[in-house]
Amino acid sequence: PPHRTIMGVVTRSAEKSYPATIESRIARTYPNWALSVVGEGSRLRMMEHIINAYSEADSRIQPEEISEKERISDRILKGRLGEFVSFLSLECYLAPEAMSSVITRFQECPDLDFLYADEDMVRENGEFLDPFFKPCWSPDLLIGMNYVGRFNVMRKQLLLDIGADWGDIANDGFYHLVLRVAEETNKIGRVPQVLSHCHITDESSDITAGQSELDVTAQMKSLQDALNRRGESADVVRDGAGKIKVHYRVSRNPLVSIIIPTKDRWDMLRQCIKSVESVTRYPSYEI
């Protein structure tokens, strides 16, 4: 079977949560894998006893300590990579069938470059909740949110083509990298199975509850950089609820034709026209 490299990334939320053992993240139904646990020195040392124990028991598991002046992306590209490269946040773990399901999909669709899968959340007591059944590839939705999530798999060649300029994935939750993937290829697919489970605490309502302000700022910068690269005239902002949104700037006022298909219902037509005239602030429209 094809060799697959899993990059387990130590993030801030992994530090303050309770990552399960490295063993629980490795799907046992697919044999040909290697796991690199990647993180900045101080983060990695918080999990040192866990990583070393499994590294001594299985040589396929290796820690990759990153210096403060080194980017994770540079270290990953310098390392030995399998035919497929997978990124997994260490507050998540894989379903037992995850790797075999992904490789099977790549074999069924050999033109695909990148795959993502459905996911859910798991509480400290082992309760699974909030499954996220994702749509097929949607570049527009990706601009609104990182719906691809915290587990994905790509061909090594795609990662090499993108290069190292995709930021610190430990901060922005892989968003920068996925946005770069979307600019490099449209051969992107979904595995319609829940293949990863992300830990949340009993106090958290969702996986984003533990995000720091720095994480959100990094995501906003990743999105703004992507819009700039694509030549979009837009600004990334936060709304009153703290959610990230994109405001596209309108440089001209093209004519908008409003079609109302109820000409024989004067009562409805009058109300509709009145609402358009009283509410809209856009100057260039016709009814």
Question: Model-flagged regions — what are they?
Answer:
Residues 93, 97-129, 201:
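Conserved donor NDP-sugar-binding/catalytic core segment of glycosyltransferases
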Residues 39-47:
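A conserved acidic beta->alpha catalytic loop
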Residues 66-80:
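Glycine-rich, basic loop-to-helix element that forms the pyrophosphate-binding segment
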Residues 80-93:
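Short beta-strand-to-loop acidic/aromatic patch adjacent to the donor-nucleotide binding site
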Residues 1-24, 224-278:
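N-proximal low-complexity "stem/linker" segments adjacent to membrane-targeting elements
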Residues 23-32, 108, 274-284:
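Short, acidic, metal-binding catalytic loop of nucleotide-sugar glycosyltransferases
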Residues 22-23, 82, 95-108, 159, ...:
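Short alpha-helix within the catalytic core of nucleotide-sugar-dependent glycosyltransferases
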Residues 139-224:
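Conserved nucleotide-sugar donor-binding catalytic segment
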